[in-house]
């Protein structure tokens, strides 16, 4: 069996930390975008944290958003490009801390976007500080 990554996924190294799930999740996301036939009609919105590194490992269309503002940005992209598959891709810190109100209100408005939240239980891009999803007793750089 000869397996090959879709052309949407560039070959080579990524900037993700060893053991980080973003690379795997990103690859699965873009493999599915290709499988569904949306490679020419998809936009992925990422924030400034770790997920923004996906922009450098794919040939997909991206929009960068401020930290925690992925969902309102994705909502605007969807309104401008109604026929596109719009994916909001961000981490738990962005979704459940600074962007929590956007998470709630996007759900209430029933926005027609795909939302992916990667829960690594810390603010990873800034060194592993506690996040709203940090487990009790979990060691972080900002834990007591």
List PLM regions with ranges.
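Active-site diphosphate/adenylate-binding microenvironment
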Residues: 2-66
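N-terminal low-complexity, intrinsically disordered patches enriched in charged
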Residues: 28-30, 85, 133
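Hydrophobic/aromatic-lined pockets within catalytic cores
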Residues: 34, 108-111, 130
